[in-house]
A protein has these predicted regions:
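Phosphate/adenylate-binding "loop-and-lid" substructures adjacent to NTP/NAD/dNTP-binding pockets
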Residues: 2-135
């Protein structure tokens, strides 16, 4: 970087907002995502992990990670307006998610979302199994 070039950074006060969470939204490219995009991202992770756990009987993430990301999602949902939260991709399936369990979420998905997220979960699970075999 040139000496005179300015380093791109978050507006003051925004960085600390995400510092103690497992997913750091203060870093690029997600630093400028809308709150509904951040919620959608966390929802997608929770749903994929739930599919893996409840349908493959295995998880690629420890329970503590699932719990921390769930807590981050719940707190982010509480911190935004209802209108912003309702813009999230999977609001219709996770409107009452409180972080305690995700067993019923996959069954609530629209067929197209269910197919997409199950496919994603299958690919992630398959790669995780290959990685585990190398250990």
């Amino acid at each position: 970087m040139r000496k005179d070039a300015k380093k791109e950074s978050m507006p003051e006060g925004k960085e600390s907002k995400y510092k103690n969470y497992p997913i750091d939204f203060s870093k690029m490219p997600c630093a400028y995502w809308s709150d509904s995009a951040k919620i959608s991202y966390l929802q997608r992770r929770i749903i994929v992990w739930s599919i893996m756990y409840y349908e493959h009987d295995e998880s690629c993430v420890p329970d503590i990670t699932y719990d921390e990301v769930s807590k981050q999602l719940v707190e982010l949902q509480k911190s935004v307006s209802k209108q912003e939260w309702e813009k999230s991709t999977y609001y219709y399936a996770m409107f009452d998610f409180n972080g305690s369990t995700g067993f019923d979420i996959p069954a609530r998905l629209l067929k197209k979302d269910r197919v997409y997220l199950t496919g994603l979960a299958n690919v992630i699970h398959s790669q995780w199994k290959k990685d585990q075999a190398k250990l």
